[in-house]
Amino acid sequence: MKAVLFDVYGTLISTGTGSINAVKSILAKKHSEIEPEAFYAEWKQLHKKRMRQTLFLTEREIFMKDLAELYSVYGIAGDYKEDVKIMLESLYNRTVYPEVPEAINRLSKKYEVIIASNTDTEPLLQNFDYNGLVFGKIYTSEGLMAYKPNPKFYLTILNECGYSPEEVLYVGDSCEEDIIAPSQLGIKTALVDRKKSGNEYGQTFSINDISQLCPILGC
């Protein structure tokens, strides 16, 4: 094995409660009595659906379309283009998991470490800068114009980096996007199971945090 590809959010960087807090702020601004958790659950489903459509849209564009649709469904009056900024701002200043910097440093001495994330580029780079993280190769869905689990996402990265599927390990916390989809392409996978659920999706390895990769990979 020559390289390790990392998902970011939920894997290297915590999303915390930023998204649900943003929803609460949006609904409070509208003086709405809609249950924030239910509203957010619908938002996530719309977001995922748009990520899977044929026409590529950036996450920023998807967030706007999502909120416009939700405002229409719930009869909420207001400027969704203005209100969505609350959600977009929640994407910044997210915090790295504590074990990550040292683990990445150890892994990078033996393997090429590559970022492969379902996100727009600018917020991701801001989060890396905020946490003092530096990576040589960073791939985003915006740059690739494809979202996981589209095979194009993984295959373009492999092609540009000059690796075969057998030469890399993909590490992430999503069963479909980080385990099932890359596994179908012949890529080894590591599930980051921070909640220690013990779920099996056909992953090569299961870890509870990134530091556990080091002994597995001989670092």
Residue ranges and their predicted role:
Residues M1-P98:
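N-terminal helical cap/lid subdomain that shapes the substrate entry/recognition surface
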Residues M1-V4, S32, G78, P101, ...:
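Asp-based, Mg2+/Mn2+-dependent phosphohydrolase catalytic module
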